[in-house]
Amino acid sequence: MKLRIKVKPNSRTDEIICEADGSLKVKIKAQPVEGKANKYLVEYLSEVLNLPKSKIRLLKGESSSFKTLEIDSEENYVNDRLSMFLKHSQS
């Protein structure tokens, strides 16, 4: 399945937020330097989704805050796992 997200690196905490428009924003602690944030994003999502890192691949957005990921898993499973960690935006 493909997942479009907005990433906010250099955050105080790692968290997944559902924005008011329904889009997903992932805050991560890693700095956006030399691909560290992208690597950390895959590691973080691997933990959240309980999948090996090899099942998560960055398709688009290597140097952008908007990213498209390919996740080699059933869509229902991914959605269920994400919903366990989801916080809703206050705006």
Regions from the PLM with identified roles:
Residues 1-27:
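N-terminal first-folded block
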Residues 7-9, 30, 73-75:
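Non-catalytic surface loops within mature trypsin-like serine protease
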Residues 12, 33, 76-78:
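Generic "edge-of-domain/loop-turn" microfeature
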Residues 15, 36, 79-81:
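Short acidic, gly/pro-rich beta-turn/loop elements at beta-sheet edges
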Residues 19, 23-48:
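Compact, glycine-rich, soluble single-domain proteins
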Residues 53-55:
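Short acidic capping loops at alpha-helix termini that bridge into adjacent secondary structure
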Residues 57-91:
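C-terminal structural segments of small proteins and small subunits
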